[in-house]
Amino acid sequence: MDVTILSPLAVGLGLFGMLASLAFLIGFAYRGWTVLLLAPFAAMLAAAISGEPVLAHWTQTFMISAARFLAQFFPLFLLGALFGKLMEDSGSVKAIAAYMTEKLGAHRAILAVVIGGALVTYGGVSLFVAFFVIAPMATALFQAANIPRRLMPAAIALGTSTFTMSALPGTPAIQNAIPMPFFGTTPFAAPGLGIIASIVMVGFGLWWLSLQQSRAKAANEGFDGFDTATKSAKPAASANLVRERATVSQSFDPEEVQRGHISEDLPSFGVAMTPLVLVVLTNFVMNVIVLPRIDADYLADVRWGETSLAAVGGVWGVCVALTVAIVALVLLNRRRLPALRETIDAGANASVLPVLSVGSLVGYGAVIAALPAFAIVREWVLGIGGGPLVSLAVATNLLAALTGSASGGLTIALDALGSTYLQLAAQYGIDPALLHRVAVISSGTLDSLPHNGAVVTLLAVCGSTHRESYRDIVIVGILGALLALVVVIVLGSIVGSF
């Protein structure tokens, strides 16, 4: 709608409705209320204040948008959670952590924690599964090296939820999959820029953590704790406040960590790594070799939703990769999975609440974007100086920060403005792959604010508080990612995507 035909009163009420609903959503979500109820209520509140038909927005805007998100991405949530639970119960994640501990040792404790977390999450293991396994490993290493316990959350965050989530090409993280239907890209979009961004994040994060370790040593500050991680992991998983925040920000319900049966007979490092390697290799083969060679013209038919291979191929590739890895994992570890049905049930169940929670956030964003006054917000975002890349980065950063969810904020941004950015990319000669990489990295920056579910869960698992550890999480998780984002935008603007 042309904003010039709206009266000042209508514009004012519309903007007030958006802000009031957002404040309501953030405030109650931070207190642990379920977003499944908060999101539709907040959306209806905004619609009512704006003078829009409330029930029509609930059933025709909110629900249709949420259902579209589930239709596009539920297979990835399902397979990702199932794979993560199988990796945990087979002892594979623990075996990788033990190998890192043995090979790198206490004198390289921070590096061991970062590499261990990166290996399992880049291979497709859900973030929360990695938290509950890497935290005890980090506790043992930090205690042996007498490194302050307060640095543990930042070290784990650097390895599990920064570059492996948003920058490394081919990562099966849901955030890396979301732009694919909007831009017709693959998980390997802008691989060179993604690798450079990863180097920036890792280098900056390790530099900061090493600096803090040296300062602590000079001040005679030691570990000063006990094995809080192993003692607090299970209660943290079941705490309702943590659970409600966590399922909005990541694709695994931490409640299901407690279910199933974790094998005490650990596989070898090679066996444990095989499924992770298969995820990356199969994903690459599908997106680079197989899918480009198949005839998928039939997808344009009404029967298949009048879509295209460019819109669905990236998701197909990740789905096949995770499926191949799951089959291989079960075959390699069958005797270590005596309660296979319980493990599979727990993994499948772990995907439901997160996908519904993020879908509800997406539905909320769709209602906000459908309000007439949103045209003002849209014009402001698109009018930000620096071109489409800067505008896209700012929009995604803000929405990820406000929702406390990288996937939710990213989807809301692309639902509202994705087609516009694609048109601007064609106008400015920007490769859609560059849009993809900028959007994904942007989603993983300001999402790590204090109310983010992953931050809350990580601190609980490590037995730390915001006061003790959040500053270092900000430095390695937010500042490092923002620095990498600036590098990618500058390089992409100068030399394009590569």
State the predicted function of each range:
Residues 17-29, 40-49, 79-82, 116-121, ...:
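Hydrophobic core segments of alpha-helical transmembrane domains in multi-pass membrane transport
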Residues 15-19, 37-40, 74, 107-115, ...:
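Hydrophobic alpha-helical transmembrane segments
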Residues 2-18, 50, 192-343, 461-462, ...:
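Long, contiguous bundles of hydrophobic transmembrane helices that form the permeation core
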Residues 2-82, 95, 99-103, 278-360, ...:
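Hydrophobic transmembrane alpha-helices of multi-pass solute/ion transporters
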Residues 76-80, 103-140, 355-368, 382-423:
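Hydrophobic alpha-helical transmembrane segments of multi-pass integral membrane proteins
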Residues 107-120, 147-164, 190-195, 199, ...:
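Alpha-helical transmembrane segments of multi-pass membrane proteins
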Residues 100, 104, 348, 458-479:
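Interfacial loop-to-transmembrane junctions
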Residues 31-35, 70-73, 84-94, 121-133, ...:
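Short helix-coil transition sites and intra-membrane helix breaks within transmembrane domains
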